[in-house]
Curated annotation (Swiss-Prot):
Superkingdom of the organism of origin: Bacteria
Protein family according to the UniProt entry: Belongs to the ATPase B chain family.
Topology term for the membrane: Single-pass membrane protein
Key word Metal-binding present: no
Record's protein name: ATP synthase subunit b
Annotated transmembrane regions: 7-27
Length: 156
């Protein structure tokens, strides 16, 4: 064989190798590369979707936190208003109770003063009768002179 025939045979073998490679080797390689490219594209798309979902979730969390903060502030204000109302109500009840106690004490003092005056009248009447007995040197009968003694008590 000459160089030209060898070259021609090598070209044919190379052509057969290229055809064999293109028919049997190249399709699985391109398929694997395409699948890999598709996986990468799907992964990038999923990452973009996850990024937008994360941003949306972050926004929802911020809104819910703001709403919760507002609700907490409202509840605290309501609780404070209720506490003030309870305090004012307790003050009013205590004031009413104090006024009742003072009124009862005044009524009791007035009653005691009336009783003391009555006892004093009784004592003054008894002293007046005793004085009259000694002046008259005779005994005054309380049953007989009850009307006179009652008039004397009322005058005192």
């Amino acid at each position: 064989m000459s160089i030209n025939a060898t070259l021609f045979v090598q070209a044919i073998v190379f052509l057969i190798l290229v055809l064999f490679t293109m028919k049997f080797v190249w399709p699985p390689i391109t398929k694997a590369l395409d699948e890999r490219a598709q996986k990468i594209a799907d992964g990038l798309a999923a990452a973009d979707r996850a990024k937008t979902e994360l941003a949306a979730a972050d926004q929802r969390v911020k809104q819910e936190l703001a709403a919760a903060s507002n609700e907490i502030a409202t509840r605290l204000a309501d609780a404070e208003r209720r506490a003030q109302a309870i305090i004012e109500e307790a003050k009013a009840r205590a004031n009413d109770e104090g006024n009742k106690i003072v009124a009862a004490a005044r009524a009791e003092a007035e009653q005691q003063a009336i009783q003391a005056r009555e006892a004093l009248r009784e004592q003054v009447a008894a002293l007046a009768v005793k004085g009259a007995e000694q002046i008259l040197r005779k005994e005054v009968n309380a049953g007989v002179h009850a009307d006179l003694l009652n008039r004397l008590k009322t005058e005192l």
